[in-house]
């Protein structure tokens, strides 16, 4: 079965999968060809029969979700946006940048005039390199998609000149840094109508749910802690919210189709799980529905039969779990230099690099590769001794009666259930581990 997958830069990829393949099979093949290990940040989108943008459920068959016959047309998109310094791979960062660039040019991200000037210069640097008087004005107008005033153009030119020697990768990273500070970063928008038929936009993001008018002017913002429940029935999505008075109110959102309503319901549940939870619960992972054939088979044959089973959600890991999983995968693959980009100075232009940078006087007899391996082992050792909740203080408390020792005293006192086995905590016992870092005298080479 053939699938055409379009990247954010409009490059088309042909992907051949089995006729009964799930969406995950297609996404994994795309990411493998792009050299991306951080697959969990991405998803595949397609357009429904009524023009709505829908996420392919990666755990279900492709052919059962798409209209018509193969070849199917899909779009590779970032589903979960994270801070730039949490992205470990250059390839992943590049796809993030392409998606952000597409959103900027389409006007989906609102930025201030100062940010627009800086972003225009950075986008020109990523596409054309250092400032060139012969192509500068054309470049800026092409990127901004509008006529520029002379004062704005001069400001962009000045900014672009300051970027001389900055590599494409560094410029892309700076774009991500600027955009990640914007209010609407990482928000997925859905077109809805309220109970009175008024057109609205619902934004589902890391911090909560935004309700806006069609011009993105805000009406209300709902934080996740006050959301009691989200449910879907047909084309409608119901959101039960706790008011400041303590009473509950049910908000109704009407969608253009049942699949669009399912998409909003999925977005609320999966986004909350990804950004706000320690792990994806089994209640989310195992929620499914059955078609008629599968329902009959479960009644008369076996309740656990997979026939006709369609999973509601496809999220597998939270943001923290994705980061940890990617670090382990990259380390096992031999990629050990995973220092955060925020801790490095921006890489210079390849034309200005020097061959002398290959030698290092601080390694004291060890090769740079050996030094990096030891530094990574040391980092993992220190990290293993940190509280899994705050990742700042050292582990010094045991949960009873389960016996898991994974948190510091302050975090353990706030937990009612063990974050590892989910069993109820009756009391917390302070412990003195012989692996305290001060006793080990750990220092970086």
From Swiss-Prot:
Taxonomic path: Eukaryota, Metazoa, Chordata, Craniata, Vertebrata
Post-translational modification (record): Autoubiquitinated.
UniProt keywords, alphabetically: Cell membrane, Cytoplasm, Iron, Membrane, Metal-binding, Transferase, Ubl conjugation, Ubl conjugation pathway, Zinc, Zinc-finger
This protein's pathway: Protein modification; protein ubiquitination
Region (Disordered): 340-363
Reaction(s) this enzyme catalyzes, per UniProt: S-ubiquitinyl-[E2 ubiquitin-conjugating enzyme]-L-cysteine + [acceptor protein]-L-lysine = [E2 ubiquitin-conjugating enzyme]-L-cysteine + N(6)-ubiquitinyl-[acceptor protein]-L-lysine
Keyword Transit peptide: no
Pfam family, one: FERM_N
Known partners and oligomeric status: Homodimer. Interacts with the E2 ubiquitin-conjugating enzyme, UBE2D1 (via RING-type zinc finger). Interacts with myosin regulatory light chain (MRLC) and TMEM4.
Primary location class: cytoplasm
A GO BP entry: negative regulation of low-density lipoprotein particle clearance
Regulation: Can bind 1 iron ion per dimer. Iron binding seems to decrease LDLR degradation activity.
Membrane topology: Peripheral membrane protein
Residue positions binding Fe cation: 360, 363, 368
CDD domains attached to this UniProt entry: FERM_B-lobe (cd14473), FERM_C_MYLIP_IDOL (cd13195), FERM_F1_MYLIP (cd17104), RING-HC_MYLIP (cd16523)
Protein name: E3 ubiquitin-protein ligase MYLIP
Region of interest (Critical for homodimerization), residue spans: 431-433
Location in the cell: Cytoplasm; Cell membrane
Residue span(s) of domain FERM: 1-279
Tissue specificity remark: Expressed in liver, spleen, intestine and adrenals.
GO-annotated cellular components: cytoplasm; cytoskeleton; plasma membrane
Compositionally biased residues, Low complexity: 342-363
InterPro entries: Band_41_domain (IPR019749), Ez/rad/moesin-like (IPR000798), FERM/acyl-CoA-bd_prot_sf (IPR014352), FERM_2 (IPR035963), FERM_central (IPR019748), FERM_domain (IPR000299), FERM_N (IPR018979), FERM_PH-like_C (IPR018980)
Top-level taxonomic group: Eukaryota
Molecular function (Gene Ontology), one example: zinc ion binding
Domain remarks: The RING domain mediates ubiquitination and the neurite outgrowth inhibitory activity. The FERM domain binds phospholipids and mediates lipoprotein receptors recognition at the plasma membrane through their cytoplasmic tails.
């Amino acid at each position: 079965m053939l699938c055409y997958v379009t990247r954010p830069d409009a490059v088309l990829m042909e992907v051949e999968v089995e006729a009964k393949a799930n969406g995950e099979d297609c996404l994994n093949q795309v990411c493998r060809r792009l050299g991306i290990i951080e697959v969990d940040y991405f998803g595949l989108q397609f357009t429904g029969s009524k023009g709505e943008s829908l996420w392919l459920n990666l755990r279900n068959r492709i052919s059962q979700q798409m209209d018509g016959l193969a070849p199917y047309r899909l779009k590779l998109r970032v589903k979960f946006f994270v801070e730039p310094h949490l992205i470990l791979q250059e390839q992943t960062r590049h796809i993030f940048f392409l998606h952000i660039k597409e959103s900027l040019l389409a006007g989906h991200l609102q930025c201030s005039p100062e940010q627009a000037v800086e972003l225009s210069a950075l986008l020109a640097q990523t596409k054309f390199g250092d400032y060139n008087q012969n192509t500068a004005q054309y470049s800026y107008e092409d990127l901004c998609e509008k006529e520029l005033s002379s004062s704005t153009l001069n400001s962009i030119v000045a900014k672009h000149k300051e970027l001389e020697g900055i590599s494409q990768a560094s410029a892309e990273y700076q774009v991500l840094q600027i955009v990640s500070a914007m209010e609407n970063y990482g928000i997925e928008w859905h077109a809805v109508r309220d109970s009175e038929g008024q057109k609205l936009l619902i934004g589902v993001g890391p911090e909560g749910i935004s309700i806006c008018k069609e011009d993105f002017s805000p009406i209300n913002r709902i934080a996740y802690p006050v959301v009691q429940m989200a449910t879907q029935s047909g084309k409608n999505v119901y959101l039960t919210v706790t008011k400041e008075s303590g009473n509950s109110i049910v908000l109704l959102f009407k969608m253009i189709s049942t699949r669009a309503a399912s998409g909003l319901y999925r977005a609320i549940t999966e986004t909350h799980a990804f950004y706000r939870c320690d792990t994806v619960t089994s209640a989310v992972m195992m929620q499914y529905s059955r078609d008629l054939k599968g329902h009959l088979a479960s009644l008369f044959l076996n309740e656990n039969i997979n026939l006709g089973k369609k999973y509601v959600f496809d999220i597998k890991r939270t943001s923290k779990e994705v980061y940890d999983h990617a670090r382990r995968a990259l380390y096992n693959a031999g990629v050990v230099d995973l220092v955060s980009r925020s801790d490095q100075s921006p890489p210079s232009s390849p034309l200005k690099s020097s061959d002398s940078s290959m030698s290092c006087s601080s390694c004291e007899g060890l090769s740079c590769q050996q030094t990096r391996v030891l530094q990574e082992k040391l980092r993992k050792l220190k990290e293993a001794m940190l509280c899994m909740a705050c990742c700042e203080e050292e582990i010094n408390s045991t949960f009873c009666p389960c016996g898991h020792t994974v948190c510091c005293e302050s975090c353990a006192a706030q937990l009612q259930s063990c974050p590892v086995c989910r069993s109820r905590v009756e009391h917390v016992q302070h412990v003195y581990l012989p692996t305290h870092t001060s006793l080990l005298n750990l220092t970086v080479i």
